[in-house]
Amino acid sequence: MVEKRFPAAGRDAMAYVLAGGRGSRLKELTDRRAKPAVYFGGKTRIIDFALSNALNSGIRRIGVATQYKAHSLIRHMQRGWNFFRPERNESFDILPASQRVSETQWYEGTADAVYQNIDIIEPYGPEYMVILAGDHIYKMDYEWMLQQHVDSGADVTIGCLEVPRMEAVGFGVMHVDDKDRIIDFVEKPADPPGIPGNPDFALASMGIYVFHTKFLIECLKRDAADPNSSRDFGKDIIPHIVKNGKAVAHRFTQSCVRSDFEREAYWRDVGTIDAYWQANIDLTAVVPELDIYDKSWPIWTYAEISPPAKFVHDDEDRRGSAVSSVVAGDCIISGASLYNSLLFTGVRANSYSKLEGAVVLPSVKVGRRAQLKNVVIDHGVTIPEGLVVGEDPELDAKRWRRTESGICLITQSMIDKLDL
């Protein structure tokens, strides 16, 4: 874990989490919930990582902007993030789109989602604003980024990842000088600029920005008055500052939080079914790339009161077992076998069923003799007895949402259409 060597800037900052996006590439997983509300890691939701990073970084004022199908996200935060105390100068504001500046205008972009709540932000008087995306998996101490922002005198400091240059085509990319001052910002370039001294890599935006609050509000008001703006940080606010002010890149390797078991700086955009499945399955490794057991940097969440997991039956062909798997509380593995799988709370896996490479969301019931391989099963699904998934690619593609790599997303509506 990184060690602080400077006065805490987090106490003078407010974190503002942008959590209104659908995440359409997750397909049916976001039919009923926003991407930040999607379950991750057996216990948490995706948004818990950005919120936990802020809390662990010493930030005690947090706002969360919501929009698309926000009920489950809001309910989760009301239950799990309701411990902030105003008498300690703490606050946690949930800010759903509510036409606050116009009777016809919802949040029209990421910048607009902050602009419409300026009157809520200003009374708190934060000196700095830390703008965060609420849909990524990573551990980061924002104090280091705040301190760089203060020391550099930048108008904006942007969190960046070093990625192979040809993988940067899907990101906003920073063209920097040898002191990491940003001299150009290009959104999803066909030919990303390389890093000085390391031309095979590019600096990709993490969607994390630090501003002085007064300067940010000036930028948002100017942008709101521009009829040609799309009201977006990446498309409008940041390019304007790069051109007319001082923008500095902050490299994730300088502030990522790693335990003794984590070798690399871990950041994932779990925005596709394949990426979501892989990031969850990664947690079943003996030494996972992401250490969610690090008590010095806990991932806070809402946890239901539930009994422990239970494994029953010990016959030769009917043994409740789990190998290289993560199993949450209130699961009953009744004569089923799990391998390289991750189960959320309340799953029931019945006799003779076999799960391999399965990511199983809460309250799923797996019928007897089901054979499930390389699947993501949505919340509350009932798997019929004897169902086989992962053996016949053509049949799977007809029944489920099957990716090119062979991962099948299964929802209850898909099950209901089966003619078994």
From Swiss-Prot:
Enzyme class at the top of the EC tree: transferase
Catalysis: reaction(s): alpha-D-glucose 1-phosphate + ATP + H(+) = ADP-alpha-D-glucose + diphosphate
Highest taxon above the source species: Bacteria
Annotated alpha-D-glucose 1-phosphate binding sites: 107, 172, 187-188, 205
Membrane-spanning residues: none
GO molecular function: ATP binding; glucose-1-phosphate adenylyltransferase activity
Listed pathway(s): Glycan biosynthesis; glycogen biosynthesis
Keywords on record: ATP-binding, Carbohydrate metabolism, Glycogen biosynthesis, Glycogen metabolism, Nucleotide-binding, Nucleotidyltransferase, Transferase
GO annotation (BP), single: glycogen biosynthetic process
Enzyme Commission code(s) on record: 2.7.7.27
Nucleotide-binding among keywords: yes
The keyword RNA-binding is assigned to this record: no
Pfam families cross-referenced by the UniProt entry: Hexapep_GlmU (PF24894), NTP_transferase (PF00483)
Signal peptide: none
Annotated family: Belongs to the bacterial/plant glucose-1-phosphate adenylyltransferase family.
Function: Involved in the biosynthesis of ADP-glucose, a building block required for the elongation reactions to produce glycogen. Catalyzes the reaction between ATP and alpha-D-glucose 1-phosphate (G1P) to produce pyrophosphate and ADP-Glc.
Record-linked HAMAP family: GlgC (MF_00624)
Self-association and partners: Homotetramer.
The name this protein goes by in its record: Glucose-1-phosphate adenylyltransferase
Naturally occurring in which organism (per UniProt): Rhizobium tropici
